[in-house]
Amino acid sequence: LPLALAYVQYLNCTNRRDGDSCGECPNCRQIAGLAHPDLHFVFPVNKQGKKSGEAVLSDDFMPLWRQVVSERNGYFSPQEWYDRLDLGRTLKGAISAREADGIIRKLSFKSFAAKYKCVIVWLPETMNEEAANKILKILEEPWEKTLFVLVSERPDLLLPTILSRTQ
């Protein structure tokens, strides 16, 4: 995750120096703060405690996500994340089809302030088949200046249809 964030920050830095991002321009500061309008996160969540049929999205957990990434400097395990979601040891998170719809919707808008619109997908191996099918086309042929960064701990568990469309 830290490398993905550094890469996105470098791509969108308006004042690169010595092969690195400046860390000072508005884009760098917003990306470092996980609050840039052209940076989107997708990560596994669970509808624990929600009413049946009520979907949950990564956006519902952004304040907690920012807190965990900040506290741990981006280095934390899936279980640490699930513990923060109060899922215990048996429940896990997933990336849903509704989340995939949200990704497509967010990326359909024009870039707000950065050179690239970026989506960091943390643990894409938790994406269900329906979600994967929904994003296949945009993953294979993303819109201009759109970047997906998949951060996987178990690439062997990625759906073959997703894996075949990545570099």
Model regions and ranges:
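Conserved Walker B catalytic segment
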Residues: 117-118, 122-147, 154
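Short glycine-/acidic-enriched loop or helix-start segments at secondary-structure transitions
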Residues: 51, 160-161
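Clamp-loader machinery-focused feature within the broader ASCE/P-loop NTPase space
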Residues: 1-130
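Conserved adenine-binding aromatic site and its adjacent loop/helix in ATP-hydrolyzing domains
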Residues: 105, 137, 164
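A short helix-turn-beta junction within AAA+ P-loop NTPase domains corresponding to the substrate/partner-engaging
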Residues: 161-167
